[in-house]
């Protein structure tokens, strides 16, 4: 799965600070989205081939340590095979804690000058700067999936990169089609 997604990703970070700034913004967007989930709908599967909202949220969270371990940032995959946290607040807290750990570890272990270094990832050689880009793109990809499921379940969807349908009214404008 990761290989198909990343084969087309040609962009990469050349600055740790640029990545950390983007990563913090993405964390805010992810927490905003996770905060709109409900305990009543988190485990609903809208189709047998579609993950539940909580499973997608947990996948986003687990990827922080899974990719971090594969990239050499962590000794072990700290969240591997752990169950989904029982409540949404616990899931959000876990996401924030491990995102913070990832950012701190990137800052400590990697430098701008080694972002061109190659790391074996999923049977391919990736530059460290590409790994950072994939972390961002992967999370955005799965958040997008979550917004569709949220709409289908009747949950409000927050704007991430622009206003959502629900937010257009606050601008005094009708929602765009």
Task: Put a short name on every predicted segment.
Residues 1-11:
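N-terminal amphipathic/basic-hydrophobic helices that include classical n-h-c signal peptides
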Residues 15-18:
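Short Lys/Arg-rich basic patches
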Residues 107-122:
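Acidic catalytic patch
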Residues 69, 73-110:
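Helix-adjacent hinge/juxtasegments
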Residues 9, 20-24, 28-31, 41-81, ...:
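Short, contiguous alpha-helical
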Residues 34-36:
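His/Met- and acidic-residue-enriched segments that coordinate or traffic transition-metal cofactors
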Residues 105, 113, 166-169:
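A general structural signal for short secondary-structure boundary/capping elements
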Residues 13, 95-98, 122, 161:
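Sequence-level detector for tyrosine residue identity
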């Amino acid at each position: 799965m990761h290989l198909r997604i990343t084969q087309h990703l040609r962009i990469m970070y050349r600055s740790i600070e640029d990545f950390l700034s983007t990563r913090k913004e993405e964390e805010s967007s992810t927490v905003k989205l996770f905060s709109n989930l409900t305990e009543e709908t988190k485990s609903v599967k809208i189709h047998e081939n579609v993950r539940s909202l909580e499973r997608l949220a947990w996948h986003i969270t687990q990827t922080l340590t899974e990719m971090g371990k594969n990239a050499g940032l962590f000794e072990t995959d700290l969240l591997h095979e752990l169950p989904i946290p029982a409540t949404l607040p616990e899931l959000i807290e876990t996401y924030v804690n491990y995102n913070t750990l990832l950012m701190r570890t990137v800052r400590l272990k990697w430098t701008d000058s080694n972002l061109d270094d190659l790391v074996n990832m999923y049977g391919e050689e990736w530059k460290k700067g590409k790994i950072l880009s994939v972390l961002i793109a992967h999370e955005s990809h799965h958040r997008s999936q979550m917004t569709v499921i949220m709409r289908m379940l009747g949950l409000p969807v927050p704007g991430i990169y622009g206003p959502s349908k629900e937010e257009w009214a606050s601008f005094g404008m009708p929602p765009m089609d």
